[in-house]
Regions:
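Long hydrophobic segments that form regular secondary structure
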Residues: 766, 770-780
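Generic alpha-helical transmembrane segments
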Residues: 717, 761-763, 785-799
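Membrane-water interface at loop-to-transmembrane-helix junctions
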Residues: 739-761, 780-786
Length: 858
């Protein structure tokens, strides 16, 4: 659509609209704002924690305890309930502020032409048809079509993923092009880095690209897998308890036993079958795990997502600022030879190497390239926050950093002064300066697109000086430029010539007869730790998918360098032509996506999830936020990430280090391993208690354990070792295993078989000791004490043997988990206290044990 057609469609012109029209349109379109969602109050968040099924089961256990008259234990259980709720509340209190962060990105004011006059108004009052003026440093207040432009460049990395400032033009473009290629448009929330323009507002508020992203982020997040599995486990356990309790009640009642005895037995069964410590131990494992992650720069914002991270099968990662440094770096120079430049980012440390040998910056061809790069340049490098930053254009900054690496930047600047400048623009495609240089006179320096710079050159550089530039030379140079571009390098050609102070200063004269100096290739380089992180991920069975707004060639080259994918790249326009079914069919075959929008990222994540993957999505820009929300776990970068992305995420990487993600995955696996161990341990004890009571009653024996005794084991004695299991250190093989099946139940079938086997052994031992003691000693309380202590010690043995589900505990370092050892000691003391402290003997109806009974137990 042409500019005239846009103006006509919006019923506007180059002078904008009138104030009257603006009022009418404001009432029609609404304010230029993003919606503010209703946020739950802190009280509602806290109350919501009590709706968890396992918490409801605990509350039921407390009620049962009150009925049984065990008020102390009931209060203990309620205390656990409140503690679990508080921990969950604290973790989630500040969650989901993404919409608020998005609103903060919108410019508060805008310069607009109304009634033919320039005025400044609140950005919220902008309407379609308004003509706005934008200049360097401005935040774009709404989406708009450019009417007039002067050397305009816009930073769109947070919206599109494009790592470089984008040059904008006032021209007609095809309609079916990617968001990142719409160079005649400016978009809300992006920043003008250079030049100025006049643009007509085409969309405001939720109608903008940023507004559409805001809409994408409204989708409900699925429940974390761990939470779902624990709810399913709680339901199964509650059903089992009710069925067995009912059977025992009916069995005892049918035998003519008093109703109160049958009720007490049923209560004991209900208490036995509920692993009261499980929600607390799960929350504790998650909480301590998040603390360990925080020490490694991975900040978890939602506790259950730790388990999700540990079961990740695919990491979808943005390129710019995540896999790469986000800092343009000069990587290669081509004069009559190829020169490699080492180092990365804006840190001015590195070397210049040709054919394996280090070059000195005094060598003529290299020195000339560096001088031109500094002269034809308006950017600077400065110290910032313990590092370095570029002030100005990142591409120019890369040339400045290269001169700093050579140690000649200050010398070049101090020995020269700017005389004339012909700036870069979209039509010229080059920048030319004339500098007065000490001992050299006046020097013309030019940088720009290779084909453009070559058209102004008549000579080229050789090892022996200069020579006439031939057509064969031109073809060779352009072939070199194409080769560099194929390797994801942003290519600039550099040229120069000396002039005298008597030469004409007209631009045509200045920019003719130049000497071609060489080509420079810059790129946003991969972070040095990323290749190893990806290698470890592969070893752990985790696939890495790169999703970027950058160009196909850049994406392919970065993917090849990092070992991502097989060289195949799908672009956003191809995704637009693919149905959801087609995308799901091909999603496992492609690992690199280029020129994508926020909607594309969400589609990719959803396609992977539809194939059964657990998806982690990393990113730092606004364009990543909807996909982070859609993923099973969203991972934001802490330093370079926008507030929008951080608030949409489940985890924030504080150091922007991709390797930290791998470390977090390892920690997530450790945490889930420990939750599995703790679950197996606690369930084996609960099953053993259930079965011991059931079989004793079924065989006609009195209750072997009282409800108070069971509660003491469940809430106190078994909880200390369980805390130790929750803190078991990571084992060496944890990142050599394939990811868990996301559909695996909690506990899994093999783990349940193992758990039932342990429970059977405990039942046989406990019930056997009880029956033997009861037959030799008519004191029922004494026999129950033997059963209580026996069960307690079986619990201790079980805790220690549960340290690993993969290898024998006897092959492990016996002192490898000191917390568990202290927990076991505390558990033994808690058991002995009930047996030997007089007032506790009264409460729990226990008796001191003889040496014969201790021999039987041990």
């Amino acid at each position: 659509m042409t500019t005239e057609e846009v103006l006509s469609k919006l019923d506007s012109d180059q002078k904008g609209i009138s104030s009257t029209q603006a009022k009418e349109r404001l009432s029609q379109h609404g304010p230029n704002q993003l919606e503010s969602p209703t946020k739950p109050s802190p009280l509602k968040i806290f109350i919501g924690k009590f709706k968890d099924y396992m918490v409801l089961v605990l509350i039921f256990a407390a009620i049962i305890s009150f009925i049984a008259g065990e008020t102390t234990n009931a209060y203990v259980i309620l205390g656990i309930v409140v503690l679990v709720a508080i921990i969950g509340f604290v973790q989630e209190y500040k969650a989901e502020k993404a919409m608020e962060a998005l609103r903060e990105m919108v410019a508060p004011e805008a310069d607009v032409i109304r009634d033919g006059q320039m005025s400044t108004i609140p950005a919220a009052d902008l309407v379609p048809g308004d003509v706005v003026f934008l200049e360097a440093g401005d935040k774009v207040p709404a989406d708009g079509r450019i009417l007039e432009v002067t050397s305009l460049q816009v930073i769109e990395s947070s919206l599109t993923g494009e790592s470089m400032p984008v040059e904008k033009l006032a021209q007609t473009l095809p309609e079916d092009i990617a968001l990142a290629d719409r160079k005649n448009m400016v978009f809300m929330g992006t920043i003008i880095s250079q030049g100025n323009c006049r643009a007509i507002v085409t969309a405001t508020g939720l109608g903008t690209e940023l507004g559409r992203i805001s809409g994408l982020m409204k989708q409900e997040q699925a429940e974390p897998p761990l939470k779902i599995k624990l709810q399913q486990l709680a339901k199964r356990q509650a059903l089992l308890v009710m069925v067995i309790s009912a059977i025992v009640f009916i069995l005892m009642f049918s035998r003519g036993l008093p109703v109160i005895d049958a009720l007490i037995a049923s209560i004991a069964l209900a208490v036995a079958g509920i692993p009261e410590a499980l929600p607390f131990i799960v929350t504790l494992a998650l909480a301590f795990g998040t603390q360990a992650m925080a020490k490694k720069n991975a900040i978890i914002r939602r506790l259950p997502e730790v388990e999700t991270l540990g079961s990740t099968t695919v990491i979808c990662t943005d390129k710019t600022g995540t896999l790469t440094t986000g800092e343009m770096t000069l990587r290669e120079i081509r004069t009559y030879r190829k020169i490699e430049v080492t180092g990365a980012g804006y840190d001015p440390s590195g070397q210049f190497i040709s054919q394996g040998a280090k070059l000195e910056p005094t060598e003529e061809d290299l020195a000339r390239i560096l001088k031109i790069g500094v002269h034809a340049n308006n950017s600077a490098i400065e110290r910032a926050n313990g590092g370095w930053r570029v002030v100005g254009d990142p591409t120019e900054g890369a040339l400045i950093v290269a001169a700093k690496k050579a140690g000649i930047l200050d010398k070049i600047k101090d020995s020269s002064s700017r005389f004339i400048e012909y700036p870069f623009d979209s039509e010229r495609m080059r920048m030319t300066t004339v500098d007065e240089v000490h001992k050299e006179g006046y020097i013309v320096s030019m940088k720009g697109a290779p084909e453009v710079v070559l058209s102004h050159c008549t000579k080229t550089t050789t090892p022996n000086g200069t020579k006439t530039l031939t057509e064969e030379d031109r073809r060779s140079i352009l072939a070199d430029a194409d080769d560099m571009a194929e390797n994801a390098l942003r290519v600039l050609a550099l040229a120069w010539k000396p002039i005298s102070n008597n030469d004409p200063v007209e631009v045509d004269c200045i920019e003719s007869g130049l000497i071609f100096a060489g080509l420079t290739g810059m790129m946003d380089p991969p972070r040095k730790e990323v290749p190893e992180a990806i290698r470890v991920s592969k070893m752990a069975g985790i696939r890495t998918v790169m999703i970027t707004g950058d160009h196909r060639l850049t994406a392919r080259a970065i993917g090849k360098e990092l070992g991502i994918g097989n060289g195949e790249v799908i672009e956003g326009v191809q995704l637009d032509r693919m149905s959801s079914e087609d995308l799901r069919e091909h999603i496992d075959d492609v690992s690199v996506f280029a020129r994508v929008t926020a909607e594309h990222k969400v589609r990719i994540v959803e396609a992977l999830k539809a194939r059964g993957h657990i998806v982690a999505m990393t990113g730092d820009g606004v364009n990543d936020a909807p996909a982070l929300t859609a993923a099973d776990i969203g991972v934001a970068m802490g330093r370079t990430g926008t507030e929008v992305t951080k608030e949409a995420s489940d985890m924030v990487i504080a150091d922007d280090n991709f390797a930290t993600i791998v470390s977090a995955i390892e920690e997530g696996r450790r945490i889930f391993d420990n939750i599995r161990k703790g679950t197996s341990y606690l369930l084996s004890v609960s099953f053993a208690e259930l079965a011991t009571i059931f079989f004793a009653v079924a065989l006609g024996f009195p209750l072997p354990l009282l409800a108070a005794q069971i509660l003491w084991i469940n809430v106190v004695a078994e909880e200390f070792p369980a805390i130790g299991l929750a803190l078991e250190p990571s084992h060496s093989d944890i990142m050599k295993r394939k990811p868990r099946d996301p559909k695996e139940s909690m506990p899994s079938r093999p783990l349940m078989i193992y758990t039932l086997g342990i429970a059977a052994a405990i039942v046989a031992g406990t019930l056997g000791m009880y029956i033997i003691t009861l037959q030799s000693n008519p004191d029922l309380s004494y026999a129950r004490t033997v059963a209580f202590v026996g069960l307690g010690f079986f619990t201790v043995y079980n805790a220690y043997s549960s340290r690993s589900l993969q290898e024998s505990v006897f092959r492990m370092n016996p002192l490898g988990n000191k917390t568990l050892l202290m927990g076991i000691a505390a558990s033994i003391l808690a058991i002995l206290a009930v047996v030997y402290i007089p007032f506790m003997q009264f409460i729990f109806e226990t008796r001191p044990l003889t040496s014969e009974s201790w021999i039987l137990i041990l």
